[in-house]
Every structure is written in structure tokens, then in C-alpha cells.
Regions:
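C-terminal catalytic histidine-bearing segment of alpha/beta-hydrolase fold enzymes
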Residues: 181, 189, 198-261
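Short, proline-enriched alpha-helix->beta-strand connector loops that line the catalytic pocket
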Residues: 89-91, 193-199
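Bacterial Sec-dependent N-terminal signal peptides
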Residues: 1-22
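Gly/Ser-rich "nucleophile elbow"/oxyanion-hole loop immediately N-terminal to the catalytic nucleophile
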Residues: 46-51, 105-157
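Alpha-helical scaffolding within the catalytic cores
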Residues: 74-84, 182-192, 213, 217
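Active-site machinery of serine-nucleophile hydrolases
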Residues: 64-131
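A domain-start/cap signature at the N-terminus of enzymes
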Residues: 17-55, 63, 91, 126, ...
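Primarily recognizes the serine-hydrolase "nucleophile elbow" in alpha/beta-hydrolase
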Residues: 139-193
């Protein structure tokens, strides 16, 4: 009985701590030409207005789309909000939310065994409205002086992994590092950014939603283009490889060690 009570209290404490961490992210809106991007932002513990900070942009998956400005914090937010990490890596962390009816990228499914890893990308079209707003938000943070332009980082999971690869070629000179998780991208676009910053790619070896071939394809294209790329593939792991990625002990130290050339 005591053991059950202890486990119950442990679960309550864990969920309470996570909720408390997520409440540290302030609710914001970025409005441009009548379009609204809802996002959450975590500021450093000792934030000073005139100091420039690293910025980490995290793009969520399709399951976290909506307009509640809450769901996008489901994965990864606790890692950056952990007090030890905030002390060690002072940074501004941004979690935007894509509306339910939209996506970070425009793509369509094809044969999962074809050369594009099962997806076709509309690279001849402008970015989706949510991604465009994210791009403009990032630029505005640099323009307003709160962001260090040499330490802008981007990563994301699933749909956000696709969004990460997408924003890299649309803003090829903007970021210092990227960490796409269980996503994919356009191999023909990697030359635009391959040699500009390091990339750490993650994927589950048994992913039934976004086949692992998507990341393998991008990693090969990046290596062929001379990129500094790391690849972590988790055997037997399904689509939720973001759990493994965010648990990587070197992830944060790797991210914040990168500076734009």
C-alpha cells in the first residue's frame, strides 16, 4: 500500500513539475498582414533587455496543431525549461503553433519506396503562411536586438522535422545549427545550406509514419554536399523518436556550441 501511495505521489509530482515548467513559457502572438502566429517563449532566468541571447526555435508535429497555444509544448519544452539547463544554457526558446488546418510545409505522399522517401515537396511554391510567419518572427527577434544572430538554432519533430529542413533552404544564411527529428526534406535543396552549419538528424529505425528512409536520404544528400552532419538512428524505435532525441545527453551542449560562420 505504501509503495502504491509513493508511486502515485511520484506521478503527481512529475506531472506537476512538467506543468510548472510549461507555465514558464509566456504566451505571445505575432501578427503580420492580418495573419496571426501564436507562440510560447521562454526567456533566460536573468534576462536583460540589452543583451543578445541564443535563440532556439522548435517546430512541433501535426498532432500539436491548433489555436490553444498549449499543445506545442507537449514535447521538448520541459528539456529547455529545466532549471539546470536554463542556468547552463541561457537562451530564448520559441515554440510556435501551426493552425489545425495548415502545415509547416506543402507536400504530398507518393510511393514510400520511391527516391524521395515517400513525399513530394512543393519547392516551387512560397512557404506556407505559418512557416512564413515563423520566418518573419525570427527575423524580427534579430532586428529588435534580443537575439544573437550568430546563435540561431532550429529543430523540430515529425511535421516539424520537415519544417526544419524546409526553413533551412528558405533561410540558408540564418541558422547556426539544426536538429530535425523523424522528418524529411528536399535533397535537391541541400546545396543551399549544407556547408553553412552542422546538422544533427534523428530517426527511429521502425518508424511507420515517416519512413526512416526520409532521414537516410537527407543524410546522404548532406554528406554528398560536404555538410557537417551527425545521424542518430534508433533501432526498433517507432515514430516517437523525439523521446530518444530529447534524451540525448549531449544534445544541448552540441546545439549551444555552434556558431554561425
Amino acid at each position: 500500500m505504501k509503495k502504491i501511495a509513493f508511486l502515485f505521489l511520484l506521478v503527481v509530482f512529475t506531472f506537476g513539475a512538467k506543468a510548472q515548467y510549461r507555465n514558464l513559457y509566456e504566451k505571445k502572438e505575432f501578427i503580420q498582414k492580418g495573419d496571426t502566429l501564436r507562440y510560447r517563449v521562454l526567456f533566460p532566468l536573468d534576462f536583460r533587455a540589452r543583451r543578445k541571447y541564443p535563440v532556439v526555435l522548435v517546430l512541433h508535429g501535426s498532432g500539436e496543431r491548433g489555436n490553444d497555444n498549449e499543445a506545442q509544448l507537449s514535447w521538448g519544452a520541459d528539456l529547455f525549461a529545466d532549471p539546470a539547463n536554463r542556468n547552463k544554457f541561457p537562451a530564448i526558446v520559441v515554440f510556435p503553433q501551426c493552425p489545425k488546418e495548415s502545415f509547416w510545409v506543402t507536400l504530398s505522399r507518393t510511393n514510400a519506396k520511391d527516391s524521395l522517401g515517400g513525399f513530394r515537396f512543393a519547392t516551387d511554391q512560397p512557404p506556407t503562411t505559418p512557416l512564413l510567419l515563423v520566418m518573419e518572427l525570427m527575423k524580427s527577434m534579430v532586428d529588435h536586438g534580443e537575439a544573437n544572430p550568430n546563435q540561431m538554432y532550429v529543430g523540430g519533430l515529425s511535421m516539424g522535422g520537415f519544417g526544419t529542413f524546409e526553413i533551412l533552404w528558405r533561410l540558408p544564411h540564418f541558422f547556426a545549427a539544426a536538429f530535425p527529428i523523424c522528418g524529411g526534406g528536399s535533397p535537391e535543396k541541400v546545396d543551399l545550406y549544407a556547408k553553412k552549419f552542422p546538422i544533427w538528424v534523428f530517426h527511429g529505425g521502425s518508424d511507420p509514419v515517416v519512413p526512416v528512409g526520409n532521414s537516410r536520404l537527407m543524410v546522404k544528400a548532406l554528406k554528398d554536399s560536404g555538410a557537417m552532419v551527425k545521424y542518430s538512428e534508433y533501432p526498433g524505435v517507432g515514430h516517437d523518436s523525439w523521446k530518444n532525441a530529447f534524451a540525448e545527453p549531449e544534445l544541448l551542449s552540441w546545439i549551444f556550441a555552434q556558431y554561425k560562420k
